[in-house]
Amino acid sequence: MNIYITGLGSGYEVEHLVRLFYPMAPLTLTPPEDGADCVWAEKRPDKLWAMVRQGGKSRTVEAPLPIPVEEGGETPEFALASLTYDLLRSWTGIRPPWGKMTGVRPVRLVHDKRAAGWTEEEIDDFFLKRFDCSPEKYGMAKAIADLQEPILKMGSAPKTYSLYIGIPFCPSRCSYCSFVSCNLDRDRKLVQPYVDCLCREVEAIRDEADKAGLMLCSIYIGGGTPTSLSAAQLRQLMGTVRDCFDLSAIVEYTVEAGRPDCTDAEKLAVIREYGATRISINPQTFSDEVLENIGRKHSAQDILDCYAEARAAGHDDINMDLIAGLPGDTVEGFEKSLRQAIALDPENITVHTLTLKRASRIVIEDQKENDYADVAAMLEKCHLLAEAGYRPYYLYRQKNTLQNLENVGWCKPGHEGYYNIYIMEEVQTILSAGAGGSTKLVADGGKRMQRIFNFKYPTEYIQRFDEVLERKKGVAVFYDHDLGTETSG
């Protein structure tokens, strides 16, 4: 299946709406050959036209050109995208649960519309009628927006910020992963020089934040796999963080403990000793077969043992990640994993939907309708979380997620992950340290924003570290109301 769009400036919306039904279909720049499977969308001088052809059968639809936007109409691109969406919904029998929405932050839309003075009825119509969003998905987004409001008010106070520290090393690469990470065995010689530079960057961030008069709100050490560092390296890094910042003044300090094959009792004790208030242990699944399919080098029992060690070390706010749609998993298998996670009684359970990234090892062709039903049925099992006392507190979506579904963080009341909310709703400055780090500066209630990028790969980050420090000086400059220029590596 190919996508061909003509007559529009970009066709971005049409392209991504087609991928709600055919996730991996490529966009072509030339008309499809006669008889070839395709979705063809076209803005003609006198009308809008769309066709789907598959397996020797085809269907076409057309509509008048929309009236101009300034007269209350739609843009030609949105009108053509809607026409194509209706065609493919009828052709495939699939109703995407988020309807025509291709954006990754539906909860942010609720916040934005409320801030703009829209009534609740107008917001309802926007989601349910204009975008054909299902009542269930919209209801979840709206409930999450309600829960987030007091947290966002605190996090969006002037000159508050969160600190992200990235560890781009893993013991092995999971087949679904597209993040830049280095194999620990192959690149072990980089780890200590990287940690040394990282500590210096944390100190530089402290200095720049102080110059700008910023107040630290939360800390998140992620990856990669932060516990791929040795216990001594964790002490070095977290000791630097403790020396630089008043940890008693922040609302949250998270460390991704991640995988049990590189997390042990000593590292868990270090994480607790140096001030972390929240950790994440991420099984993804409790099926040994599925763990092997995705390239994990540990068993489900190892996850249980790691969780027990974390509790023994005194960790009292634990998140566990699961992924719906992993290779070889089933609805029954996913439900079993979900029940196992609930039985462990962590404070947070985050349910992700598998995302098809070109940089990952998983290569999946167009999803069949039964695949759609399986992944959707997996997420329907999340009612078990609500029944166990968890509630959804943040939600986001990614491009090329199976069947346009979502990732949702569930928590027990009072255990919302603040950093997750702040970064998803984009209300707060995030200062990032480490390879691949993306600092996002926010001021004037979100009216001014600027990004500062670190070099992507650890080797380049280490070799050009002086440039990393020089770029961080842009933080204080930004808050002096001199925007400067966006810099990237």
Report residues per predicted region.
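Radical SAM enzyme core and accessory elements
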Residues: 1-108, 112-116, 120, 198, ...
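Short beta-strand motif preference
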Residues: 50-52, 165, 279-281
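N-terminal [4Fe-4S]-dependent radical SAM core
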Residues: 91-95, 115-163
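Key residue(s) within conserved catalytic/signature motifs
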Residues: 143-144, 176, 255
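Canonical Radical SAM [4Fe-4S] cluster-binding loop centered on the CxxxCxxC motif
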Residues: 159-195
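Conserved non-cysteine loop/helix-boundary elements of the Radical SAM core domain that shape
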Residues: 181-380
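Amphipathic, soluble alpha/beta structural segments
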Residues: 214-215, 219-223, 401-407, 470-489
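A structural motif corresponding to the C-terminal lobe/cap of the Radical SAM core domain
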Residues: 304-317, 326-459
